[in-house]
Structures are given as structure tokens and as C-alpha cells.
């Protein structure tokens, strides 16, 4: 890894990270695998709230406390800056032990990478840091009832309100980790079209839609 620019990722450190990831997956996540299948998430139609299976939140809290949510992310935003290959090892262990649980941090990872690459500076400050820290989670909202993942046909619209604010309306389905009680806020990255967008996939834009609104500062 040193030849790839990861000077701190020596053999001793990498081995220690892998060993701890294995311990966490085996002793914390694997025992919850059956519970995830038998109990699953619970939806309360009266409130719209979703609760995760017993033990899932406690496991997620331990995952966050261990710094795993930021393992491969940029240190500028609170990450540890480890190689993506090491993150792949972690993901394989987590998902092998408990795939249902592993879907929660998996979607956050995708949201983090999108914001790192394309987010504005204020978006990185407001949304990226809590996602890397694991105090919030993220999703990717693509699929719609009428077209599945044929994104060229999506109908979700974003109407401009001000120069940097939009009113987003539409219906998304099959959103992994779209609602839960692991953290107080969920950052949804939503694919939608502006009123003057060209037809097809080329007219799609990406919008940051948090479950609860937050101020820039």
C-alpha cells in the first residue's frame, strides 16, 4: 500500500484492522443474522416510523464507535484514509456475517463517495462529515414504480424555489435503508429532473434531500 500512497497502511496495521473486523463480524453481527431474517424491520403506519430488528442499533453504535464508518474516507472529512481494498475486506466480512445489517452502512458509503466527488463545499461540511462519522446515514433514491431502474423514464421532478433550493416531488421505491431508527437523520440522494431537462437519462440531476432539514451553518 505504501507504493500507492498509503504510507501508514503497513502490514502490522492492516493485519490488526482485518483481525478486529473479523472479531466484530463474528461476535457481534453473525449472532444477529437470524434475528434480522425472522423479525425484520417493523413499520408503524400511524407514525411512518421504521424500527430495526433487536440488537441492530446496538451493533451499529459499536460500529460507529470503532471508527469503521470512516475507514477509507478522506481525513479532511473525519475519515481514516485507509485504502479502498481494506474497505473491501471489511465489507466482505460484514456482509458474510449479516447482509441485512450490512446494507445500512453500505448505502452511506455510496452517498459519501458521491458527495466527496460532486458536492459543493457547504454540502461537504454539513452532510459529509456526519455521514463519515456515522452519526447520520445516507441512501441512493433511484427506482420508481412505473419504470424500475430504467432511469431515462423517471418522473420525479425538482422545481426551483431559489438559486440553490428546489421542491422535489415524486415516488421512489425499494430504497435500501430508506427509513430506520439507527440515527436521527438520513441523507437521501435523489435522482430527479428539472422542468427544462432534456429527455432520457441525460436530463437527470442529483439532489440532496435530508429526512430533516438542516441549515448551512
Annotate the PLM regions:
Residues 96, 113-121, 133, 137, ...:
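Short, well-ordered loop/turn and helix-capping segments at boundaries between secondary-structure elements
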Residues 1-103, 122, 126:
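Amphipathic, small/basic residue-rich leader segments at the start of a protein or domain
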Residues 77-81, 110-114, 122-123, 146-150, ...:
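Flexible loop/turn segments at secondary-structure boundaries
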Residues 36-37, 44, 104-108, 116-160, ...:
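Internal maturation/activation junctions in enzymes
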Residues 165, 169-216:
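A short core secondary-structure module
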Residues 61, 67-70, 100-104, 137-139, ...:
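Beta-sheet entry/capping signal
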Residues 44-61, 65-73, 139-162, 171-180:
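Flexible, glycine/threonine-enriched loop-and-boundary segments that flank and lead into catalytic domains
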